[in-house]
């Protein structure tokens, strides 16, 4: 006989995959508790749907799986204040922003797992010698291969940094070359899996944290932009200014300035959304990058560095310095935060000296007294 099935409450929209570790996983009610209470009215939005895997299958799998880990309740749950409690804060703010600006239904699959290294997020041996018996690619990414994703948001790298804050020794963490190679391969891997060589892939650069040495991972995240096979629609969101009391976040105690989980997830999500609006939805007035180094020329005894930027360059506000060492230098008047710090120049002998740096428009002019 004939069988009739009826499906209701179905919407068609754009689907995003959220992957990485705890800064992507971080729940709205945990990372942004003061703002969460004020989201009660806006959170009720049936045009935003989520699959929140949470801890289900968080140990990964040694073999590719055809199905996602089984979850309780509605697989594509409409956004409610209750659901917002345990969803990714970045995913929540990102979806709300896109839905408001474009009017399109937005769905996202929240697959991130805290404390995970990059080797768990790509296909085993996609990069020779890089594999994990606890692969999250196998049970959280591979099962989605038939989805037509609009894009991927990725925030990861803390667990691949050196354990010794004063070491760049790759035995204590990944070298910049290692991580950038694997990061670029991960992007290629996902684009192959989803059969879309131009799949938008946006990832977050690590924020500064305490005195932890993440310079190698942050450098690697920049280098990956040049190593990926096809750079189209591969973009990095910089979070160097992201600390606990950013923008609309209500934390003003200062403690979050030294938290490995920056509280301003609404701002990170806004930056991700700017990229999506530009690349996917055709918003030509959206910014797509912070300042990016473009070229260098000499002018007598000076070096002139030119950057690509939407506006003129500026010095980071002193309240955005987020590591203990820098705070101590500021408090003891050993660091002048009204001038541009951090540039060094080397001569033919290869010895680097601190450089004087002056901002002029989109350029930085360097000189050295040595």
Tell what function each PLM region has.
Residues 1-370:
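Cell-envelope and extracellular/periplasmic
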């Amino acid at each position: 006989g004939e069988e009739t099935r009826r499906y209701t409450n179905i919407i068609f929209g754009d689907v995003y995959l959220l992957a990485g570790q705890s800064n992507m996983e971080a729940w709205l009610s945990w990372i942004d508790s003061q703002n969460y209470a004020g989201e009660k009215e806006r959170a009720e939005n049936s045009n935003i749907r989520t699959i929140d895997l949470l801890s289900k299958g968080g140990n990964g799998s040694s073999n590719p799986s055809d199905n996602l880990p089984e979850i309780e309740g509605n697989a594509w749950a409409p956004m409610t204040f209750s659901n917002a409690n345990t969803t990714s804060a970045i995913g929540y703010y990102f979806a709300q922003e896109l839905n408001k600006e474009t009017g399109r239904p937005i769905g996202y699959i929240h697959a991130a797992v805290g404390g995970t290294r990059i080797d768990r997020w790509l296909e085993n041996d996609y990069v020779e010698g890089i594999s994990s018996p606890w692969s999250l690619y196998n049970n959280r990414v591979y099962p989605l291969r038939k989805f037509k994703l609009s894009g991927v948001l990725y925030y990861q790298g803390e667990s691949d940094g050196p354990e010794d804050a004063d070491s760049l020794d790759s035995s204590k963490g990944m070298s910049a070359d290692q991580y950038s190679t694997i990061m670029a391969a991960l992007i290629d891997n996902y684009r192959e899996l989803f059969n879309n060589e131009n799949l938008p892939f946006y990832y977050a650069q690590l924020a500064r944290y305490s005195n932890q040495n993440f310079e190698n991972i942050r450098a690697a995240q920049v280098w990956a932009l040049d190593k990926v096979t096809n750079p189209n629609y591969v973009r990095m969101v910089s979070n160097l200014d992201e600390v606990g009391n950013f923008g609309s976040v209500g934390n003003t105690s200062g403690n979050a300035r030294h938290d490995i989980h920056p509280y301003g997830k609404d701002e990170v999500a806004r930056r991700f959304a700017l990229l999506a609006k530009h690349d996917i939805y055709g918003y030509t007035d959206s910014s797509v990058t912070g300042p990016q180094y473009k070229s260098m020329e000499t002018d007598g005894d000076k070096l002139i560095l030119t950057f690509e930027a939407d506006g003129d360059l500026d010095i980071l506000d002193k309240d955005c310095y987020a590591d203990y060492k820098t705070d101590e230098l500021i408090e003891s008047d050993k660091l002048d935060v009204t001038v541009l710090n951090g540039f060094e120049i080397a001569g033919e002998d290869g010895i680097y000296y601190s450089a004087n740096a002056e901002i002029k428009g989109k350029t930085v002019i360097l000189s050295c007294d040595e």
